[in-house]
């Protein structure tokens, strides 16, 4: 593939991260695992969220990110603090597609506790299959970007 998928999690998402990484590699995606590589109950999700978000922002029109924590909320909040990142917490296949089609999300945030591994795989697949539709949706994204610049 001509783009990277950066993936990371906290300790609660470690197993799911490995499952998703292997799934994507079998589909020939270029997956870059940013950690963790071992279980550490004291790790902090913002550290991994910032790693992925910083990588995605460098090539935000191509590269994508996947972040995992217990709820998906924490990594989503942290990733959205990085300028140029549009992170979406997704818990269903339908919203996975819409996050890309309508919101041009470039970071997918997943819950390892409240969504099954198999459902998360479907969410990832639908997210990656979808493309941004532009049009009226671009106007809305432009407003977000403009506000981000105005409030620096």
Curated annotation (Swiss-Prot):
Pathway: Carbohydrate degradation; pentose phosphate pathway; D-ribose 5-phosphate from D-ribulose 5-phosphate (non-oxidative stage): step 1/1
GO molecular function: ribose-5-phosphate isomerase activity
Cystine pairings recorded for this chain: none
Coiled coil (residue ranges): none
EC number per UniProt: 5.3.1.6
Keyword check for Isomerase: yes
List of catalytic residues: 69 (proton acceptor), 102 (proton donor)
PANTHER family named in the record: DNA DAMAGE-REPAIR_TOLERATION PROTEIN DRT102, RIBOSE-5-PHOSPHATE ISOMERASE B
NCBIfam families recorded: PRK05571.1 (NF004051), rpiB (TIGR01120), rpiB_lacA_lacB (TIGR00689)
Assembly mode: Homodimer.
Protein name per its UniProtKB record: Probable ribose-5-phosphate isomerase B
Species name: Mycoplasma genitalium (strain ATCC 33530 / DSM 19775 / NCTC 10195 / G37) (Mycoplasmoides genitalium)
């Amino acid at each position: 593939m001509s783009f990277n998928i950066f993936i990371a999690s906290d300790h609660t998402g470690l197993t799911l991260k490995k499952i998703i990484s292997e799934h994507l590699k079998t589909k020939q995606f270029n997956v870059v695992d940013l950690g963790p590589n071992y279980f550490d109950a004291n790790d902090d999700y913002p550290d991994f969220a910032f790693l992925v978000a910083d990588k995605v922002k460098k090539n935000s029109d191509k590269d994508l990110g996947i972040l995992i924590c217990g709820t998906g909320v924490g990594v989503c909040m942290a990733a959205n603090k990085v300028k140029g990142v549009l992170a979406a917490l997704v818990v269903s296949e339908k919203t996975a597609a819409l996050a890309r089609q309508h919101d041009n999300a470039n970071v997918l945030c997943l819950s390892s506790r409240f969504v099954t591994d198999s459902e998360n795989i479907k969410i990832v697949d639908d997210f990656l299959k979808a493309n941004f539709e532009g049009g009226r949706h671009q106007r809305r994204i432009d407003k977000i970007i403009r506000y981000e610049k105005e409030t620096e």
